[in-house]
């Protein structure tokens, strides 16, 4: 993990110094002084607009002409229009800076910031820049045994001086705890499925959360059978690896305060079962447990901050595999709620896992609010692509709060429709419901949401986040490499902090 240190200006000792310049290309007195120290290098660079325009996100690394100094490079970072800067933009700028200096093989970087930028204090800006750099520093190369030394290069340290280092440190420490939740989510999601079996994954959850004073219970197939979880168990019955239900209870508020329940789909690998998927890109189905990973990452972020809230996380961990013992299309399963479901397609398995998991959370903890997170449908990818996750909810206020939280951390949500017509589409001729709609290719994400909605108890606020299009990416972003994004952790942490802290 990138080492970030807030220190006094005279203690800065770095190879590269970051310089913020907006699109007006005007230097304040501090930058004029720095420019003079470097023999006009900054002013000469910005005078040539072919080299640097101050556009937001533009990064220009220029070698220092002062041979005797410790600073070997100046890193010009474009702010664009200061009036248009947001927390998201500042944080992502930190990520862009980190990525550029990494490519330039610069081991240590520094930032001196004493003045406000737009409406943000120097300590606020510094904490956001550092947070973005930290998130962008993530790597998953543990299985790359033949990497060349040059490809293993990482930025070692980021030293920052502000007009209030104590405040900057305090702000960043919170960001760092959230990043640890994001990194766990990315790590476990990126792991190959032969490494993260349900048992191993469950043990990793317990190892990290029990150190944060979170009570963790791991239910095996015998316990789930006794509870009547026929839907979840049906999905996993074709696998040699036993299914697990992991229950994480964090009590940061008083015992009488209501719980928030976070429920995650944890299909460790999804072949589609007997309704077998095409082989093309099937390897990406290791990411079909990203909803569960987001729940665990959120629990880490919340518990490590010791937030004064009561939260329970429930994740169903299964493998959807074909075998002689696998669930068949046409099978009928009885859920923990007592309702029955006809399994018309074994590749619509995530909703079956969630049906029992959300019911368990409600029965045991009586939460005021249930939010489930799942890479549930390909239909949501068709609808929203890789930009938005779908948000379905029975409560307008809850949906609005989630969408607002998502906007604030750039984990976007788009409200999707629920309607009685969609609900009718999952009626079955022989059971209480079917696990797919009866109109082929129609409203697939909405019918899936309605399946889960049938397991939400009276009076419970509920939201379903379908993250199938945003959980992993085939290209890097400003805040991380390609692969697992860690989507949902920062969104849910922000939502909880804004709405449930006592």
From Swiss-Prot:
Keywords: Aminopeptidase, Cytoplasm, Hydrolase, Manganese, Metal-binding, Protease
UniProt GO MF annotations: manganese ion binding; metalloaminopeptidase activity
Broad enzyme group: hydrolase
Binding-site residues for Mn(2+) 1, renumbered to this chain: 270, 347, 349
Domain of life: Bacteria
Cellular-component GO terms for this entry: cytoplasm
Coiled-coil positions: none
Tagged with keyword Metal-binding: yes
Subcellular location: Cytoplasm
Cofactor binding notes: Binds 2 manganese ions per subunit.
Keyword DNA-binding appears in the UniProt entry: no
Cited InterPro entries: Leucine_aapep/pepB, Macro_dom-like, Peptidase_M17_C, Peptidase_M17_leu_NH2_pept, Peptidase_M17_N
Catalytic activity: Release of an N-terminal amino acid, Xaa-|-Yaa-, in which Xaa is preferably Leu, but may be other amino acids including Pro although not Arg or Lys, and Yaa may be Pro. Amino acid amides and methyl esters are also readily hydrolyzed, but rates on arylamides are exceedingly low; Release of an N-terminal amino acid, preferentially leucine, but not glutamic or aspartic acids
GO BP term, example: proteolysis
Stored Pfam families: Peptidase_M17 (PF00883), Peptidase_M17_N (PF02789)
Cofactor dependency: Mn(2+)
Active site (catalytic residues): 277, 351
Positions that bind Mn(2+) 2: 265, 270, 288, 349
Family in the record: Belongs to the peptidase M17 family.
PANTHER family in UniProt: CYTOSOL AMINOPEPTIDASE, LEUCINE AMINOPEPTIDASE-RELATED
UniProt function note: Presumably involved in the processing and regular turnover of intracellular proteins. Catalyzes the removal of unsubstituted N-terminal amino acids from various peptides.
The protein's name: Probable cytosol aminopeptidase
Naturally occurring in which organism (per UniProt): Rickettsia bellii (strain RML369-C)
């Amino acid at each position: 993990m990138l080492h970030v240190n807030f220190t006094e200006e005279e203690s800065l000792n770095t190879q590269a110094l970051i310089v913020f310049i907006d699109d007006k290309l005007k230097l304040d007195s501090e930058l004029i002084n720095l420019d003079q120290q470097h023999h006009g290098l900054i002013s000469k660079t910005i005078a040539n607009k072919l080299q640097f325009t101050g556009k937001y996100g533009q990064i220009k690394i220029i070698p220092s002409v002062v041979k005797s100094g410790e600073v070997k490079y100046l890193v010009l970072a474009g702010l664009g229009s200061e009036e248009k800067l947001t927390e998201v933009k500042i944080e992502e700028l930190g990520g862009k800076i980190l990525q550029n200096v990494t490519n330039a093989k610069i081991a240590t970087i520094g930032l001196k910031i004493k003045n406000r930028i737009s409406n943000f204090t120097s300590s606020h800006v510094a904490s956001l820049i550092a947070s973005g750099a930290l998130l962008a520093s993530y790597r998953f190369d543990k299985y790359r045994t033949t990497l060349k030394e040059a490809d293993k290069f990482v930025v070692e340290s980021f030293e920052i001086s502000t007009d209030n280092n104590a405040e900057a440190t305090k702000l960043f420490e919170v960001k760092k705890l959230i990043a640890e939740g994001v990194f766990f989510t990315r790590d476990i999601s990126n792991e190959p499925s032969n490494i993260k079996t349900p048992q191993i994954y469950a043990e990793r959850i317990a190892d990290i959360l029990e150190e944060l004073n979170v009570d963790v219970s791991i239910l095996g197939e015998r316990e789930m059978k006794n509870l009547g979880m026929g839907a979840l168990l049906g999905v996993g019955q074709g696998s040699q690896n036993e299914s697990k239900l992991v229950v994480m209870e964090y009590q940061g508020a008083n015992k009488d305060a209501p719980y928030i329940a976070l429920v995650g789909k944890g299909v460790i690998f999804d072949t589609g079962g007997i309704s077998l998927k095409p082989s093309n890109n099937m390897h990406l189905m290791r990411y079909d447990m990203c909803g569960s990973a987001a729940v665990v990452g959120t629990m880490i972020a919340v518990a490590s901050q010791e937030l004064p809230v009561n939260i329970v996380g429930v994740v169903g961990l299964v493998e959807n595999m074909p075998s002689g013992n696998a669930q068949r299309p046409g099978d009928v399963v009885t859920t923990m709620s007592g309702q029955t479901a006809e399994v018309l397609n074994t590749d619509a398995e995530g909703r079956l896992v969630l049906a029992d998991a959300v019911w368990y959370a409600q029965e045991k903890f009586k939460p005021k609010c249930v939010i489930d997170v799942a890479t549930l449908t390909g239909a949501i990818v068709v609808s929203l692509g890789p930009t938005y996750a779908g948000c379905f909810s029975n409560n307008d206020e809850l949906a609005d709060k989630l969408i607002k939280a998502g906007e604030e951390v750039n984990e976007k949500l788009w409200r999707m429709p629920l309607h009685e017509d969609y609900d009718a589409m999952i009626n079955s001729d022989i059971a209480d419901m079917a696990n797919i709609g009866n109109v082929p290719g129609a409203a697939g994400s909405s019918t899936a949401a309605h399946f889960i909605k049938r397991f939400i108890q009276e009076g419970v606020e509920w939201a379903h986040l379908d993250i199938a299009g945003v959980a992993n990416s085939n290209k890097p972003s400003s805040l991380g490499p390609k692969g697992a994004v860690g989507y949902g952790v920062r969104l849910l942490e922000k939502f909880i902090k804004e709405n449930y802290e006592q």
